[in-house]
């Protein structure tokens, strides 16, 4: 885990199409509904037995279809600072533009591995015209057609060559939770970090020659042992302003991927915003434990139970269908309920390793399934005969049925909700698999 590839380039060169091709995503990338575009900004790529994360940096830029030099520069600086490999996408149909040259100049000055991707190369003649991208001074251009997938295999092979070697066996104590504190800028991440670990946070700031792998710092606070997950770049200021919202999302990726439990900080004075949903989505996609903290609760005047209930309902509604997570109202500045945060993180971590005996699972679940069976499909009745928990890091359950292919997503959610109703998995995702008996 932890290798990160960023896609950069001016608008309309095919970055999103390439992203969808590499992640094998089938989502409509032009959907306008709120929340529908966030899936295309972050994904996982599997190639030749290895896996890495990929981000389309343009996905977090508001109005990214407008060609603003400043916004393009920000994207490129983010990629240079955070990614292991940068894919610089250019449009072979339009050729080199002044904006392309500006991006290339920034990339040349960096020491980051860069692959020039000449997109929309559909035939032999196009291959010849792609030679003009040598003018970037960034090595051989890789000719692809993102729409059809032509050339992407060679591109991925090259990405594999440039990615840093995977780490060997970890020296971490696997019995201790790895905590990542994530959230939008100014939501209170630094204040909570300081409340947890005080002034020693600067002791581990500078590690010469460090890669972009996550840093694990072990702490003991309030009698609880834990690791705080950080990334090499997160404590230093780069050329990109720290308060850029999409920058904070990209910086969260490594910490999330290398954690067990994520503390998602929300600002009580602002509620749930689009970047909160982006970060939540990444936590979900990586099947991490979740504790949601409503910070700056000291600034809210009306703290009545009615207001608290309204806050809770609004937040769970925004994060649906996953709503079974602890939600704490805190103030990192005044240290209100700080111990409760760590205590809850440890509880969520324990829930991830909950094991239910098979006989008990069947004793509870089979009568429920018999009373509310899966809907019949094409006149055929679906019968679930048996259920067992799988030996996985994330709680996972296999239900054995005669026609597993006809069990739809709503019924899987029903099964998950029944498991949650009978056993405490608060804060941790559950995977439901339907297999043939």
Curated annotation (Swiss-Prot):
Cysteines engaged in disulfide bonds, as pairs: none
Keyword match Repeat: yes
PROSITE patterns for this protein: G_ENGA (PS51712)
Positions with a binding annotation for GTP 2: 183-190, 230-234, 295-298
Residues in KH-like domain copies: 354-437
Similarity section: Belongs to the TRAFAC class TrmE-Era-EngA-EngB-Septin-like GTPase superfamily. EngA (Der) GTPase family.
Record protein name field: GTPase Der
Organism the protein comes from: Porphyromonas gingivalis (strain ATCC BAA-308 / W83)
Cross-referenced InterPro entries: G_ENGA, GTP-bd, GTPase_Der, KH_dom-like, KH_dom-like_a/b, P-loop_NTPase, Small_GTP-bd
Pfam families: KH_dom-like (PF14714), MMR_HSR1 (PF01926)
Superkingdom per UniProt: Bacteria
């Amino acid at each position: 885990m932890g290798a990160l590839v960023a896609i950069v380039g001016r608008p309309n060169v095919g970055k999103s199409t390439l992203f969808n091709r590499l992640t094998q995503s089938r989502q409509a990338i032009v959907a306008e509904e709120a929340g529908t575009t966030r899936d295309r900004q972050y994904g996982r790529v599997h190639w030749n037995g290895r896996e890495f994360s990929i981000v389309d940096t343009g996905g977090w830029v508001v109005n990214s279809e407008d060609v603003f030099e400043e916004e393009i520069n920000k994207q490129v600086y983010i990629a240079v600072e955070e990614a292991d490999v940068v894919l610089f996408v250019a449009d072979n149909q339009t050729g080199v533009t002044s904006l392309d040259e500006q991006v290339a100049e920034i990339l040349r000055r960096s020491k980051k591995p860069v692959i020039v991707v000449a997109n929309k190369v559909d035939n032999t003649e196009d291959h010849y015209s792609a030679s003009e991208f040598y003018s970037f001074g960034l090595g051989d251009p890789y000719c692809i057609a993102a729409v059809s997938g032509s050339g992407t295999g060679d591109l991925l092979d090259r990405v594999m060559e440039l990615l840093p070697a995977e780490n060997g066996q970890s020296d971490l104590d696997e019995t201790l939770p790895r905590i990542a504190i994530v959230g939008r800028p100014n939501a209170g991440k630094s204040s909570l970090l300081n409340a947890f670990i005080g002034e020693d946070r600067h002791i581990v700031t500078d590690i010469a020659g460090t890669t972009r792998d996550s840093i694990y710092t072990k702490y003991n606070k309030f009698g609880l042992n834990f690791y705080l997950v950080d990334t090499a770049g997160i404590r230093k200021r780069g050329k990109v302003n720290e308060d850029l919202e999409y920058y904070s999302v990209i910086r969260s990726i490594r910490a999330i991927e290398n954690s067990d439990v994520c503390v998602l900080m929300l600002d009580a004075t602002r509620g749930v915003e689009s970047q909160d949903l982006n970060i939540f989505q990444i936590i979900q996609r990586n099947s991490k434990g979740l504790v949601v903290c409503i910070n700056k609760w000291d600034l809210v005047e009306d703290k009545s139970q009615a207001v608290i209930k309204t806050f809770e309902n609004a937040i769970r509604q925004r994060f649906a269908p996953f709503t079974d997570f602890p939600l704490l109202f805190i103030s990192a500045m005044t240290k209100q309920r700080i111990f409760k945060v760590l205590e809850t993180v440890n509880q969520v971590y324990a829930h991830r390793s909950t094991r239910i005996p098979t006989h008990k699972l069947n004793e509870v679940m089979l009568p429920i399934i018999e009373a509310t069976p899966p809907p019949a499909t094409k006149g055929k009745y679906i019968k679930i005969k048996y259920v067992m928990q799988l030996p996985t890091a994330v709680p996972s359950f296999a239900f054995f049925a005669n026609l597993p292919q006809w069990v739809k997503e709503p019924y899987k959610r029903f099964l998950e909700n029944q498991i949650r109703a009978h056993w405490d998995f608060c804060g941790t995702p559950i995977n439901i698999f339907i297999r043939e008996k």
